[in-house]
Amino acid sequence: MRRNSSLSFQMERPLEEQVQSKWSSSQGRTGTGGSDVLQMQNSEHHGQSIKTQTDSISLEDVAVNFTLEEWALLDPGQRNIYRDVMRATFKNLACIGEKWKDQDIEDEHKNQGRNLRSPMVEALCENKEDCPCGKSTSQIPDLNTNLETPTGLKPCDCSVCGEVFMHQVSLNRHMRSHTEQKPNECHEYGEKPHKCKECGKTFTRSSSIRTHERIHTGEKPYECKECGKAFAFLFSFRNHIRIHTGETPYECKECGKAFRYLTALRRHEKNHTGEKPYKCKQCGKAFIYYQPFLTHERTHTGEKPYECKQCGKAFSCPTYLRSHEKTHTGEKPFVCRECGRAFFSHSSLRKHVKTHTGVQPYTCKKCGEAFKSSSSCEVHERTHFGEKPYECKQCGKAFNSSSYLQLHERVHTGEKTYECKECGKAFLYSTHFRIHERTHTREKPYECKQCGRVFIYFSHLRRHERSHTGVKPCECKQCGKAFTCLNSLKVHKRIHTGERPFQCRQCGKAFSYSKSLHVHERTHSRQKP
């Protein structure tokens, strides 16, 4: 990739000085770069060869690039002058047949799609007027989008709200939000002559239909060098790369949280408004988006339309199916940079990363206990109210989360998909399998920040941490006694219910606690001669 000279320029002087210098330079282009190109054009008319001269002048020689921060410091008048200068420069270069190609991109993605029109060209050549040489500005050579991307320049701004865009096509799409124009209505081009033979969908450009056809052919020309995953579309490929680089360019103005994808930011922003238009009629749970709502409804209906081709297991949503399929391939593409542990899914990696950061932004309103995810906090809050909306159709047992119900259902099916390669032992649940693996590795990944004690299980760490904080969230409704964990509360309740699940095989005597049974069994062993 070509190194951007503006980056080194930025390091040397304050931003205001850089802008002033570049601004003076861009104004000077009307008398330097532009005239040089015109002189070359005139020499061609006189029969002189211009090959050596065009070789000596490139786009970088005659164009001035501003970074996004520098562009923001220019007033509207300066921006308009800059556009006029650059438009003239592009016209002149087009007249002499100058061509621009990003060789790095061509080498990296050969035969992986055509070059796209430069965002700067889109912005500067909105009017299709003719060049002095007789060529139309619409004949300016196509430029690769990466030519402008490194500079951060976004010269297309919305005249209604002032929002700035990299591509003219992005600005056109944005303008529909003001005009309420439907996405499939193309007022700019009118007819859509290119029709897909598979599904009948029509397009304005042949390039658009070629890209669309990949959905039917299954072609995935863009491959990630990090994990080998392939994509049909360039934008999907670029979004995926951010998983490996950790780049989060989209930031919420309300809370400062950053996201990899614009769609994720838009989804997050609705959390601040509190709007949840999709409500489940069965349990009353509300959702911001339709897709999670649809997936949730299937926990009540039992519908599982997505089936694994390997083992026939069915799932309620495609995400669960994709995660499951990796258990067959053994693929774990998501690696923690802190400890090197690998995961099947990106969501699992995100949950794991929080064990290193210690961030627990979600707090129970009832007892004050903090959680790493909103779903965990929501499930926990149900323990206070005794709410268990998810019921097993086999045995009638109820659970406070759909995931617990799904795990429980394996008890009836007897499915044990997770097998230890060390000893061959099989497990119903991936969590039990991972915990078992630590018996071989002796790994204790969970450390108490207060005293440094380490634990094999996260639940043990949480229980231990309460010994420092004194928090006892689990309270007995019978006598009011509080406990640090739910298991201790369950054991305590036997005092009130009289339940004695532990029975002696020798004499049949029953006990409320396993410890009491062990003590009792010793009385039999001592009686033996």
UniProtKB/Swiss-Prot annotation:
One of its GO terms (cellular component) is nucleus. Disulfide bonds: none annotated. Keywords: DNA-binding, Metal-binding, Nucleus, Repeat, Transcription, Transcription regulation, Zinc, Zinc-finger. The keyword Lipid biosynthesis does not apply. May be involved in transcriptional regulation. It comes from Homo sapiens (Human). A zinc finger (C2H2-type) spans 156-178, 194-216, 222-244, 250-272, 278-300, 306-328, 334-356, 362-384, 390-412, 418-440, 446-468, 474-496, 502-524. GO terms for biological process: regulation of transcription by RNA polymerase II. This is Zinc finger protein 490. Its main location: nucleus. Belongs to the krueppel C2H2-type zinc-finger protein family. GO terms for molecular function: DNA-binding transcription factor activity, RNA polymerase II-specific; RNA polymerase II cis-regulatory region sequence-specific DNA binding; zinc ion binding. InterPro entries: C2H2-ZF_domain (IPR050752), KRAB (IPR001909), KRAB_dom_sf (IPR036051), Znf_C2H2_sf (IPR036236), Znf_C2H2_type (IPR013087). CDD domains: KRAB_A-box (cd07765). PROSITE patterns: KRAB, ZINC_FINGER_C2H2_1, ZINC_FINGER_C2H2_2. Residues 57-132 form the KRAB domain. It is found in: Nucleus. Coiled coil: none annotated. The lineage of its organism: Eukaryota, Metazoa, Chordata, Craniata, Vertebrata. Residues 1-53 are annotated as: Disordered.
